[in-house]
Amino acid sequence: MDEKIKDLNLLLLFLSGWEEDSRNNPGEKIFRSWNGYLFEVLNQLQDENLIQQFRNGKSVILTKQGIERAEELKKKYL
């Protein structure tokens, strides 16, 4: 897969996402985004520990690594 496509999908997840309270860990914040992107791309991002997907979920969570990488991509592309 083209590395730029994967990078830009991560950036879009970040730019369209929001911070919210964790359901599992009270007091912890998570960064969530809708998962309306190519499954192949989402699976690769998860394999690289940049996002966390859920079996029947309509959203994904960006990991700390994913947020850091998205911030780098934001500086690079925007």
Language-model features: locations:
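Short amphipathic alpha-helical interface segments
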Residues: 1-40, 76-77
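Short, surface-exposed loop/turn segments at secondary-structure junctions
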Residues: 28-29, 55-57
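A short, conserved structural fragment
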Residues: 46-56
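Minor-groove-contacting beta-hairpin "wing" of winged helix-turn-helix DNA-binding domains
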Residues: 58-63
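Short, amphipathic alpha-helical interaction segments positioned at domain boundaries
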Residues: 65-78
